[in-house]
Swiss-Prot record:
UniProt protein name: tRNA dimethylallyltransferase
EC id: 2.5.1.75
Residue sites binding substrate per the record: T38, G39, S40, G41, K42, T43
Pfam families listed in its UniProt record: IPPT
Sample GO molecular function, one term: tRNA dimethylallyltransferase activity
Family: Belongs to the IPP transferase family.
Subunit-level organization: Monomer.
Length: 339
C-alpha cells in the first residue's frame, strides 16, 4: 500500500456561507466535495466539472482503493483518468486493509499536492464516513479491549452478526448507516467502544481536533435524483456490470485472495457473487443472486441518502431536467461565486 503522509498533516475545514465574500484570498484553498448515492451520476458530473475549475479528483470510495475491484465499483476508466487526474484509486492490494484513518492521511496528502500546483481538489464519492473523517480528522477512540472483543465475537457466533448489527443500529444509527450488516469486524469494534465507554463511535469521530487555522474551505454538493430515476439507474448499472464481466472479475479476485480481507469480500456486488461461485455457480440461483445484488445496492443507496441529508455542509442538487453539463456548470458557478 502506498505510504501515508505524516500524522502531523494540516487539517481544518470550514464551510463558506457568504456569497459576497471575496474569493481572492481563499480561491486556491477551496476544496470541492461532490457526494451522492450509488447511481446518482456523480462520477460523470465530476468528469465534466474538473476542466471547468481546473481540478483533479480524489475518490471517496472505500472499495475503489483496491486493485482489481474495477467493474463492481464502477471505477472510472483509464481513458478518463488520463484526461482528468484521479487520486486514491488502486492504492492497495485486495489482501491489504484500508480504513478511514488511512483515507484521511492519503486524502490530505493528495489535497496538499493538488493545491501546491494551483489546482482544485474535488472529492467525489459515496462513502459517507470517509467524507466525515476528512472533514473532522481521523477518528479517535479508546484502546482495544481484547477481552470484550472476544466476548462480542462469541456473541456473534451465538446470536448471529445481524443481531449485533441491529443492536448497533439502536445505539449508534449514524455510524451503523456507514457500514453493512455483514461487516463483522467493524460491528464488533463499534460495540466494543460503546460498551466500554458508553459513547457512540460517531461522536468520537466528530470530536476530533480541527486545526484553528481553517486552512481549507469546503464547498459540498449532494446529487439527489428522484428515487424512481435512481432505482432505474441501479437496475441498468447492475445489468451493465454483469455484461462487462463482473463474474470474471470476482473469479480473479478470489484467486488474488480477496477472502482474506473481510471488508473487500463483503462489499456489495462482490459478496453476492462470491457466494454464488462458492456454491458452484448453479444456473437456478443466478437470477436469485442477481436480485440480491440489486436489492442490496438499493438498500445501500437509501442509507447513503440518509447520511448525506443529515450533513448540513452539502447543498442538494436535483438533476431533474438537467444534463451532466448543466450540473457541472451549476456547481462551477456556485464555486466561483463563493470561492
Amino acid at each position: 500500500m502506498s505510504s501515508s503522509s505524516s500524522s502531523g498533516a494540516a487539517t481544518g475545514f470550514a464551510v463558506c456561507s457568504d456569497p459576497q465574500k471575496s474569493f481572492s484570498k481563499m480561491f486556491k484553498r477551496t476544496v470541492i466535495l461532490l457526494a451522492g448515492p450509488t447511481g446518482s451520476g456523480k462520477t460523470a458530473v465530476s468528469l465534466k466539472l474538473a476542466p471547468l475549475v481546473d481540478g483533479e479528483i480524489i475518490s471517496v470510495d472505500s472499495m475503489q482503493v483496491y486493485q482489481g475491484m474495477d467493474i463492481g465499483t464502477a471505477k472510472v476508466s483509464l481513458a478518463d483518468r488520463k484526461e482528468v487526474p484521479h487520486h486514491l484509486i488502486d492504492v492497495c492490494h485486495v489482501q491489504e486493509s484500508f480504513n478511514a484513518v488511512d483515507f484521511y492521511y492519503h486524502a490530505v496528502q493528495a489535497c496538499q499536492d493538488i493545491l501546491s500546483r494551483n489546482k482544485v481538489p474535488i472529492l467525489v464519492g459515496g462513502t459517507g464516513f470517509y467524507f466525515h473523517t476528512f472533514l473532522s480528522g481521523p477518528p479517535s477512540g479508546p484502546s482495544p479491549d481484547f477481552v470484550l472483543r472476544e466476548q462480542l465475537t462469541l456473541e456473534a457466533q451465538e446470536r448471529g452478526i445481524s443481531a449485533l448489527y441491529q443492536e448497533l443500529e439502536l445505539l449508534d444509527p449514524v455510524y451503523a448507516a456507514t457500514i453493512t450488516k455483514h461487516d463483522k469486524n467493524k460491528i464488533i469494534r463499534a460495540l466494543e467502544i460503546i460498551r466500554k465507554t458508553g459513547s457512540k463511535v460517531s461522536s468520537y469521530a466528530w470530536q476530533s481536533t480541527v486545526n484553528e487555522s481553517k486552512e481549507y474551505h469546503c464547498r459540498g454538493w449532494l446529487l439527489s435524483p428522484d428515487p424512481e430515476l435512481l432505482r432505474h439507474n441501479i437496475l441498468e448499472r447492475c445489468d451493465q456490470m454483469l455484461e462487462e464481466g463482473l463474474l470474471d472479475e470476482v473469479q480473479a479476485l478470489l484467486a488474488a485472495g480477496i477472502k482474506g480481507n473481510s471488508s473487500a469480500s463483503r462489499a456489495i456486488g462482490y459478496r453476492e457473487w462470491i457466494e454464488f461461485l462458492d456454491l458452484g455457480s448453479p444456473p437456478d440461483l443466478f437470477e436469485i443472486t442477481k436480485q440480491k445484488f440489486i436489492t442490496n445496492t438499493w438498500r445501500y443507496t437509501k442509507k447513503q441518502r440518509t447520511w448525506f441529508k443529515r450533513c448540513s455542509l452539502f447543498r442538494e442538487l436535483r438533476p431533474m431536467g438537467m444534463t451532466l453539463d448543466d450540473m457541472a456548470k451549476k456547481i462551477a458557478q456556485d464555486y466561483f461565486l463563493c470561492g
